[in-house]
Amino acid sequence: IIVEDPDSVEPLNTILHENGKYIIGRMGIPYHKRKICIISIALDAPQNTISALAGMIGNLKGISVKTAYSSVISKD
């Protein structure tokens, strides 16, 4: 997740909080020189849930998101 608009941080955090049961870990990196934040999030969720979450996040102003999927399939 790349955050270019600081005003979108609060709605982003709300979305992440609402989906916290899927979040394994989160790392935020402030890049002061470029005035952006880079956020990496590891999720354990069905692919459709991840896609929906990425869509919600990507619709926020000044935020872009990319997803990567593992080939590991859960038996849970």
Regions found by a protein language model. Name each.
Residues 1-76:
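Long, contiguous binding/interaction regions
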